[in-house]
């Protein structure tokens, strides 16, 4: 059942019950909800349709040879500027996107005697001196104004990058004399709030930008985000511009948070609780990782997943409050490019067909995603960094521009502007344009209710519907061809299915459809005659509790030495520990080579290892996956080889490790306490 429909229905029933009991006024919780600043439904409605193209300004395109930083992180020319973006607007528009996001463009003034590392950091824009001036190495206020106006004339929203939690040490006052308070990283709230409210409003009113991407949004408390959201809404309503259709409109006022973590941390530091929103949209880092782990590998070379891995990640959206609007991306300026991940995993090279097929599969998933999506420049042409694939040592990678957190900041390859694309690149670009155009024409894709039909090692299939627009999205997660038999009753289809790209029709035969799917192929099939799908509402039994001594939560601790000499901890991205060794997550020895710790856990998917405080030894589950109640082999861990533990329910869990007599790892289990 739709979480939002369920909650809405439940709210009505509760309200009716309260009325029947003679409730005389709002409860304390209701007063708190009414006092909070709600997410703007008009902004949310339009934001579903966002197809954003991200530009790293200093590395993108050199449009003015007289300016530029000339240094920075990554392997680019480091001469990118605003004019280069203006020169690329026709190309960007041709992709079928409808928005651009620029990394920070505000002035970062050198401090006398600063070293080359500070010069490189200045080029990123992420530590600004003057939030109210355009960096002269990027351009002028007039150039920025021209960029925004020309983008709007092409039907492109423009989003700036807001760094509201840190700044350069030589930060200068706002036009009204305000300054951020506290240290430079992070600043102090609520004292810094008026300064950043002024920043947020200034650029909307001055240039009529359409909103903000929010860097390290966890640095700003939820209450401050409510105030900044209201400032952005008010500023957006105070000005207008004429769009590409000749309509007079207000700036959109969209804001999207960067919180590089799991669903629970994104809730805690970004979205806020149900009924009391902090922020309304955040990048979907959890699903991004599952996406690359399915079609390539992640930055730590872990991959080989299938459709069920994607389905599990999408199902975890249920953890978010109703106002949450995740924004999915394949990459960004802090992540390794998808093409380089394919090479890191020894999966495919740019000369291989599969390199391009896997790109198309991953990008198709974005096109079928409900909510805003973001493309990083170069995604559309399968870009990669020459002579780079494996991780480079931290001692030398920054000098070479090859650290994982900045290697994707390569020079922009814009056809007809800064590069000439080859046939493979042109083909992928045309495919992306086709996807974006199709997505814009089908509300089922960008706003539809999602029903997963099939998810296994070989394929992922969703049914998407918005009003009478219904589409079946299929994507292969294997290199083998297959024939899919799809039941019409399950799909909610009473007639043909029609391929939205090829026009091919699949007739209904004996209650089902047969759809061929090549390796890593994606298809979008319109349901010509949609009906209510037959959904099995019987709750599937969840196995969360195991059997045997490893599943017992009350085994007594024994006062004797076990086979492991150091104290071990469950260490991971839990909201109560954040990869720190906490006493409440320390294992105790129970005898028989068994170590256990009982903890209170939230529902969700967590990345973790079992380690001593000095990380020697450290252990992980074999296969890097752990399911509740299932005994799994334990093996030696290392950096990046994290166990992904899926806990479908909140509650008390026991974590158990067993070892051989000689101290070698044996098995691991997590089990919900009964």
Regions from the PLM with identified roles:
Residues 198-199, 205, 210, 215-326, ...:
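Active-site-proximal helices and loops of the catalytic beta/alpha 8
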Residues 110-127, 164-190, 230, 266-282, ...:
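Aromatic- and acidic-residue-enriched segments that line the glycan-binding/catalytic groove
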Residues 2-5, 9, 13-16, 20-56, ...:
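Carbohydrate-interacting/catalytic domains
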Residues 79-91, 189-205, 359-363:
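Short, acidic/polar
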